[in-house]
Amino acid sequence: MPKGSGKVIAQNKKAFHDYFIEETYEAGLVLQGTEIKSIRAGRVNLKDAFARVHNGEVWVHNMHISTYEQGNRFNHDPLRTRKLLLHKKEIEKLAGASKETGYALVPVRIYLKNGFAKMALGLAKGKKQYDKRHDLKEKEAKREIARAFRDRQKM
């Protein structure tokens, strides 16, 4: 996350399990009034979200922002497609990279920065099943080492 960033609202842990995140970009979100209120309340889910470049614009799909509790009949659609704000050169770079086989644009986290909702968008390459198993083995080994050090400290 860039320096000076604010409060993290939601993280996409599944993205780190399913993909190698090679680069991340900070993108602004085009939101409606009730959507930002729901985000500030922490009612957002990035689990199945993905982004696509279409006509020189980046759009995020399947990002679920729950309806605002105190909203009236003008409440938003929870799964609507939302536009992301990026610089033109970043969009061109993402468009070229996402056309390559095996690459995807995945939302990594949503956070508030200076009162505005921002999204960390990752350029990701899919993991194979054996990569996932290897990561789990490494994680378990680190846990075992930490546990051994803790037990040794107690003695």
From Swiss-Prot:
Coiled coil: none annotated. Transmembrane segments: none annotated. GO terms for biological process: trans-translation. Its main location: cytoplasm. GO terms for molecular function: RNA binding. Keywords: Cytoplasm, RNA-binding. InterPro entries: SmpB, SsrA-bd_prot, SsrA-bd_prot_CS. NCBIfam families: PRK05422.1, smpB. Required for rescue of stalled ribosomes mediated by trans-translation. Binds to transfer-messenger RNA (tmRNA), required for stable association of tmRNA with ribosomes. tmRNA and SmpB together mimic tRNA shape, replacing the anticodon stem-loop with SmpB. tmRNA is encoded by the ssrA gene; the 2 termini fold to resemble tRNA(Ala) and it encodes a 'tag peptide', a short internal open reading frame. During trans-translation Ala-aminoacylated tmRNA acts like a tRNA, entering the A-site of stalled ribosomes, displacing the stalled mRNA. This is SsrA-binding protein. The gene is smpB.
